[in-house]
């Protein structure tokens, strides 16, 4: 039986107001360990930058499982050194879904081709495992994946193409197109906020 109790929390802003600041998180774990010592059994962070800062500053030496979010390359590699795990937002599937919907529109084929229905090259994702479709939103969503000691090696090569959708389409049926695709958040301030 486990008891979950929040010992402390803090908004992680630096003096310039930037949020989710790794250095602030590293400093916070020092303050918290001075106050709570061996009462800290696990560290959970909203991102791997802060998680890795707390892991390197204290949790690694004290063998306290630390978990983050984003599957940053340093966090994935640190799983071999005791970092508890992270969450991949499945960026490869996010990119594939975006480009595949665009490709399907350009080719004039069913929107689900190569997503939930195999295309001529055999590309097909698994709904509920790789993505979900919302009829109400008319949107595809990549599903997050837990990255743990059991599977972290699958996430060490960021250039690896996702096997389920790695096959090239026939150029004669899907000719090359010149497309400008610009993606950013609505406020266009993600890195500066």
Regions found by a protein language model. Name each.
Residues 1-193:
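A residue-level marker of the well-folded mature domains of exported/periplasmic proteins
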């Amino acid at each position: 039986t486990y008891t979950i109790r929040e010992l402390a929390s803090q908004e992680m802003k630096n003096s310039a107001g930037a949020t989710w600041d790794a250095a602030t998180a590293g400093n916070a774990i020092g303050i918290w360990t001075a106050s709570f010592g061996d009462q800290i059994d696990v560290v959970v962070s909203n991102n791997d930058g802060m998680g890795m800062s707390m892991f390197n500053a204290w949790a690694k030496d004290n063998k306290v499982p630390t978990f983050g979010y984003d599957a940053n390359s340093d966090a994935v590699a640190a799983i071999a050194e005791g970092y508890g795990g992270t969450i991949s937002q499945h960026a490869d599937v996010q990119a594939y879904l975006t480009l595949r919907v665009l490709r399907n529109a350009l080719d004039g084929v069913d929107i689900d081709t190569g997503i939930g229905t195999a295309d001529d090259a055999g590309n097909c994702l698994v709904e509920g495992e790789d993505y979900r479709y919302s009829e109400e939103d008319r949107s595809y969503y990549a599903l997050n994946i837990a990255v743990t000691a059991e599977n972290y090696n699958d996430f060490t090569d960021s250039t690896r193409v996702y096997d389920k959708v790695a096959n090239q389409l026939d150029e004669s049926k899907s000719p090359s197109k010149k497309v400008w695709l610009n993606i950013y958040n609505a406020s266009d301030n993600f890195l500066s906020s």
